[in-house]
Amino acid sequence: MEKDYLRISSTVLVSLLFGLALVLVNSWFNQPGVEEVVPRSTYLMVMIALFFIDTVAFIFMQLYFIYDRRQFSNCVLSLAFLSCLIYFVITVIIIQQIIEERLTSSVVQNDIAIYYLFRQMSLCILIFLALVNKVSENTKQRNLFSKKMTLCISLFFVFGGPIVAHILSSHYESYNLHIAELTNENGQVVWKASYVTIMIFMWLTLLSVNLYFNGLRYDIWNGVTVIAFCAVLYNISLLFMSRYSVSTWYISRTIEVVSKLTVMVIFMCHIFSALRVTKNIAHRDPLTNIFNRNYFFNELTVQSASAQKTPYCVMIMDIDHFKKVNDTWGHPVGDQVIKTVVNIIGKSIRPDDLLARVGGEEFGVLLTDIDTERAKALAERIRENVERLTGDNPEYAIPQKVTISIGAVVTQENALNPNEIYRLADNALYEAKETGRNKVVVRDVVNFCESP
């Protein structure tokens, strides 16, 4: 988990530094003559960067919802990022209009401010709806809104919000909402404090509610905390636009970009971690937590198909008279015996050896880079450890001593398929059990001749 986090964080950091360098270079070569304004090309670059970041976040959250449909809150959270995408597209179109000199700077700045206000409100409200669903999922309580109603409300803010913002923009003068305007000095933008205060209050409320219910756990909702906290910071900066227009804009947009990148890292790490857990569950035996039969055969297939000529060994182990243990002491004790034997085998083999449960009381071990003599010595050590440590040992709470029989085959040929190799090891195990149990039979595949 930590390695994935470091790799993704490093990639994001390099991308961020590269992006900031492009913005600074662009601003340097596009310095205005009289007005102290942000170059429109720089504005476009930032909007496009935020667009792609939110696109990645939207896709990841949708995939995570498809992966686990019980987490409906992830679906609502993905719609929050989708709403941002719509507003970013509209903002880019508006900026293009002023570049083509279709509208005055004052009108365009006010329209941009309107869509920014609605983008912030939609993002905050949709995240809040997702949070409400998450709390109900965690507490198993009935949600205030049904999933269908929540989805309808979310879709209204995703698609209805831009329509309302369009009506309140310069396209309809009778409904035009005046949020920001250019000052007479240096063309700086001044926001009305009341609208900024509303946004700050909404984000502070969301931040407080999220911290109350989710705390600072390392999961997706930790990313929501980052979004809300940074939104408070860069919206507070709007209050100082009248005095420090350009520098404040760069600071606020940098905070927003960094916060979105941080959230993307958190989302990716969380989702990759969840997928790893699922994969691990699919490959593990639920009782012993060692690998299961399917994983063992997959690894055996890979090993047998390898072009390397290094010898490897397949061991099959079986607990002697295990049915008698179950009949005498019951299945719970039988399960404890299985876990005890697994623990002893795990401590007896090498760190790189693969241990799996291939049957009820049967276990398989795949060992690489080992010859016949070393395989026989290792198998004997395993057998002796099981016999010795299960007798009168307070470390293992089992009522009687148990023994195991081991059959093994060593080969370095890749002519045999996995089933044939396993069958040879199983035949060696059969020989060990038929000739007295509690013993080891190891065969080299070249010298092992089966009876017809």
Curated annotation (Swiss-Prot):
Its EC number is 2.7.7.65. Coiled coil: none annotated. The keyword NADP does not apply. Pfam families: GGDEF (PF00990), MASE4 (PF17158). Binds 1 Mg(2+) ion per monomer. The record marks K323 as: Transition state stabilizer. Induction: CsrA binds to the mRNA and reduces its levels. Expressed at low levels at both 28 and 37 degrees Celsius. Residues 1-7, 67-74, 133-148, 217-219, 276-452 are cytoplasmic. Gene3D superfamilies: 3.30.70.270. Substrate binds at N326, H331, D335, R381. Keywords: Cell inner membrane, Cell membrane, GTP-binding, Magnesium, Membrane, Metal-binding, Nucleotide-binding, Transferase, Transmembrane, Transmembrane helix. PANTHER family: DIGUANYLATE CYCLASE DGCT-RELATED. This is Probable diguanylate cyclase DgcT. It comes from Escherichia coli (strain K12).
